[in-house]
Amino acid sequence: MVKGVKGRPNVLAIVLAGGEGKRLFPLTEDRAKPAVPFGGTYRLIDFVLSNLVNSGFLKIAVLTQYKSHSLDRHISLSWNVSGPTGQYIASVPAQQRLGKRWFTGSADAILQSLNLISDEKPDYVIVFGADHVYRMDPSQMLDEHIASGRAVSVAGIRVPREEATAFGCIQSDDDGNITEFLEKPADPPGTPDDPDMTYASMGNYIFTTEALIQALKDDENNENSDHDMGGDIIPYFVSRNDAHVYDFSGNIVPGATERDKGYWRDVGTIDAFYECHMDLISVHPIFNLYNSEWPIHTTSEGNLPPAKFVRGGIAQSSMVSSGSIISAGTVRNSVLSNNVVVEEGATVEGAVLMPGVRIGKGAVVRHAILDKNVVVRDGELIGVDHVRDAQRFKVSAGGVVVVGKNQVV
């Protein structure tokens, strides 16, 4: 692990957390995508922050912009690691240091925050996204980046070629040098050792600091640039033969099983978000939340009582978080966040219920996601009458009904 001890490089981690997440609407109607609750007790940003902290990186700047109040509050309450040793996880909003404008792209976000780099004077800068579900030890990627001698390393995950058209794709030679970076290509390139697989970019990068600063300044003066890390900065280095691919399949996380090794999910759509939750409650989930050797950290639930099941209330094949009460109701194949109440005769099946949701007596909720503080009236049906659902709520391509935050239905 890289812990900033004597003889180790000085590293600053920057987490890009300003994403709007339009494809997750209405879950992102009132919050930034990285702040969306996940897995009962977490938020999406907890995964990248846990990976960095577990790996020993404790100088972390989280760049925020879009509807960031929930995210800022979560970071301040859950991720307070500041101390006399210079460790911190800080939420950094758009500061308009280069004029009265917001971030125009992910590269522009870092350009406008170069003061963070000049203050820390790091040898290397980690730039990771904030909205994926995975475990990773970034220190292993840093070690390989240093050994490569390149200006940037891009984390690549192996995906079948036919599934890679939705990603930024990496073509590399046998030595890991990136020869081409293609955005959502119709014919993705194979990996050097397997023509049926493609390196898809995970949106995680490690830069040698001086090279990153120069690239950002050159990009600022490029009128044809969209000022995007994946779309502009990485191709900038590829064109200079100065980019390396890091094969994520070789990343070894303590406590990982063969089943969840190399797991990484983009939960940027309602269906992907829902399916990822359904995996969590399976008997043998691909992604194991219960790995104590590489924990996913979040707000302590020490002040909440345990979940309670009364008057014959039951939960089968489900995750039920602290403070929740199931009173003579039935929950199956569902994920319940904190302080959820399921009342007498209610049925919840195949659902994701976020904090504070209340399901009234005799109500039925199926194949649905209910955002924070939704109240379902007695006898109401959700996920039963598809025509009526479509008239009232968003329904995904996969048929998942989504009820937005604070609604009473």
Curated annotation (Swiss-Prot):
Q: Show the catalytic activity.
A: alpha-D-glucose 1-phosphate + ATP + H(+) = ADP-alpha-D-glucose + diphosphate
**Can you name one GO molecular function term for this protein?**
ATP binding
How is the quaternary structure described?
Homotetramer.
Keywords assigned: ATP-binding, Carbohydrate metabolism, Glycogen biosynthesis, Glycogen metabolism, Nucleotide-binding, Nucleotidyltransferase, Transferase
Question: PROSITE patterns, from UniProt?
Answer: ADP_GLC_PYROPHOSPH_1, ADP_GLC_PYROPHOSPH_2, ADP_GLC_PYROPHOSPH_3
Q: Which domain of life is it from?
A: Bacteria
**Protein name, UniProt field:** Glucose-1-phosphate adenylyltransferase
- One Pfam family assigned to this protein is Hexapep_GlmU
Which parts form a coiled-coil structure per UniProt?
A: none
Its pathway is: Glycan biosynthesis; glycogen biosynthesis
Job description of the protein:
Involved in the biosynthesis of ADP-glucose, a building block required for the elongation reactions to produce glycogen. Catalyzes the reaction between ATP and alpha-D-glucose 1-phosphate (G1P) to produce pyrophosphate and ADP-Glc.
Q: Is-annotated flag, keyword ATP-binding?
A: yes
Q: Which GO terms describe its biological process?
A: glycogen biosynthetic process
Give the E.C. number(s).
2.7.7.27
Q: Which family does it belong to?
A: Belongs to the bacterial/plant glucose-1-phosphate adenylyltransferase family.
Binding residues annotated for alpha-D-glucose 1-phosphate, in chain numbering: G168, E183, K184, S201
